[in-house]
Amino acid sequence: MKSTKTTNTNKKDPMGLTPSQIVNELNRFIVGQEKAKKAVAIALRNRGRRKRVEGNLRNEIVPKNILMIGSTGVGKTEIARRLAKLTNSPFYKIEATKFTEVGYVGRDVESIIRDLVEIAVNTQKTIAKTEVDINAREKAIERVLESLVGKTSSSKTREKFQEKILSGELDDTEIEISVADTAPVGGGSFEIPGMPGASMGVLNLGDMIGRAFGTTKTKTKKMLVKEAMSIILSEESEKLIDQEKIIQQAINLVENDGIVFIDEIDKIASVANSGAKNSEISREGVQKDLLPLIEGTTVNTKYGPVKTDHILFIASGAFHIAKPSDLLPELQGRLPIRVELNSLTKEDMIKILLEPETSLIKQYSALIGTEKVELEFTNSAIEKIADYATTVNLEIEDIGARRLHTILENLLEDISFRASEMQGEKISIDDKFVENQLSKILTNLDLAKFVL
């Protein structure tokens, strides 16, 4: 049997990372949950593999979507978010309950893809503007100079004022300058016939017509030089970038690299014998609407049609009441990879406080450090904080690592309030300090429910 041809792997491309390298990258920020990390690492690697497959077979290879099962605060969202950041993939998170709270059914579920495309377009536009920044800045300075000294001024005068603009000396000087008129005409938006869900604002239509004829409506305004530079820089950048190219790049990124994270999917599962028939119908309707989106369909957006066949969907839920088997069988089939995330232990809490590159202890120490106050946590303090977090999670409600945020906020409240008056001091947080600050709250569980 002949092997399928593949193209060469580009080692600099994030898609070329091996599963073990991806897991190592995730380990820098997330503690534990090896099964979930391994699942997303394989999914990402397979995405890269598909790109290197030649011929028609490439289009037949679809991503194996993932269902993450675990309590809140155990790292489900963070794993997906870090994965997207690692690969610079367009990423969009949405709660499945958003489509039931206001009775969303049918085409409204497609807003997920429209929002994802919007994110990708804005990201590509930002990158493109960075590339033309020098030219755009020069043109912006020229326009501001014309308002300040006129078109007929000498080169010496222009150079002198240009230096003042660059140094910020004229930031608070008021000028009168012509800028693009961004006031909406008529307001609102309308549906495009034959394109469900693809709405177009009146302003957008006018803008498109203006572009087609090379004209843009302008308005003369009075503003400060600093404000004018910001507005004109944006205008000149828009003129220099290729809008059509940006849109095509964004759509291509969404179609091939997009990641959609659907949280709280357990909340739209139909629980047997629940007795609430209307809500069951609503939930089942949302599930049915999600099916084509996850399986692969074409969604019409204001930027053009977008195929969802190769977008990676990661769904997650706690499944305390409902079970994964309560989801529609068709939806279960479209989420073939299931991973269960473990509840966090005391040891996990200690690692979360210390090990990640952006750990909570490092964050709080850096924040207080800006006031020239050194914050030091002893090992006994870390252990005590982790112990309290685990206890509250067990006795009140398990919110995972998020419990550490509430505990640290209460623990450091006085220090945060008085830090500006404590410059030059070094504060040591030990187990006794932790106990003094939190023991009264923890002994009163009713109070802890509201405070922690």
Swiss-Prot record:
Question: Any idea which positions bind ATP?
Answer: V31, G73, V74, G75, K76, T77, E78, D263, E330, R402
Q: Which residues form a coiled coil?
A: none
GO cellular component terms, semicolon-separated: HslUV protease complex
* Keywords annotated in UniProt: ATP-binding, Chaperone, Cytoplasm, Nucleotide-binding
On the tree of life, the source organism's domain of life is Bacteria
A Gene Ontology molecular function term of the record: ATP binding
State the compartments where it is located: Cytoplasm
* InterPro entries linked to this entry: AAA+_ATPase (IPR003593), ATP-dep_Clp_protease_ClpX (IPR050052), ATPase_AAA_core (IPR003959), Clp_ATPase_C (IPR019489), HslU (IPR004491), P-loop_NTPase (IPR027417)
Listed under GO biological process in this entry are:
protein unfolding; proteolysis involved in protein catabolic process
Fill in the subunit field for this protein.
A double ring-shaped homohexamer of HslV is capped on each side by a ring-shaped HslU homohexamer. The assembly of the HslU/HslV complex is dependent on binding of ATP.
Can you tell me which family this protein belongs to? Belongs to the ClpX chaperone family. HslU subfamily.
Known role: ATPase subunit of a proteasome-like degradation complex; this subunit has chaperone activity. The binding of ATP and its subsequent hydrolysis by HslU are essential for unfolding of protein substrates subsequently hydrolyzed by HslV. HslU recognizes the N-terminal part of its protein substrates and unfolds these before they are guided to HslV for hydrolysis.
Give the protein's recorded name.
Answer: ATP-dependent protease ATPase subunit HslU
The gene that this protein is the product of is hslU
